Amino acid sequence: QWTLAQHLALSGPQAPVATGLLGGPEFTARSLSPRIHGLLARRHGLRAAYLRFPSAQGARDLEALLALGLRGLSVTAPHKRAAAAAAATLSEAARAAGAVNTLLRAERREGPVWSGHQLDAEGLVRGYSDWRGAASLALLGSGGAAAAVLLAARELDWREATVYARSRAPAAELAQRFGVRARPLQELPAARAELLVSSLPVDLPAELFPQPAGPTPRALDLRYGPQTGFQALARARGFAVRDGLAMLVHQALAQFELFHGCR
């Protein structure tokens, strides 16, 4: 639930330029996005506010936040597909992914609308350019972040992608959208992966871990912060490991530029 102070901060003649983060409560609570956007605003001397908007019902809250006058929103799990559906227009990348992580206010004669953008993929391309090239990609998960991985894979030359997920219908839809394979998560132990990417919000059980392949097997956990169980297991299996902080920082830089016109 949003506080009265947050509502008041968005109104009045002295109100700052307001943006924020919309997502599930468990994701907005631990996100570093407010800190990053705050640091960027101070660096540029901007009067700006970046607020957390924990939400269990993304579509309805997107309408309310548009009415409040926000200039833009960062969108995190589980609302990236709902945000794409709520946007009046989509960037080319957002349309290709079917999910957005950024909404920008656009004024129309009939009233304001959201335009949707996909900047997670840009964050991946900029943040992991030194991991360019992989003969096989095992991607865990089938949500909005997974779509961004497959979009970035085209530029990063991550080939032969297979989506592994518990929920078959979303995985099949994602695989069809990008022309890759989809398999049940239970089949992952039989796989060999040169690049293993987890977009899951939880750790992968040890018994489901695949075998590394190629001369330089790598594993990327899109979560960031203290070492996760996934990262520890990947190291133990022989993968070089990185977390998702570089993606977060680079997509935040792109978001800030979209919101404020400076990076």
What feature does the model see in each segment?
Residues 218-263:
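Rossmann-fold NAD(P)-binding glycine/threonine-rich loop
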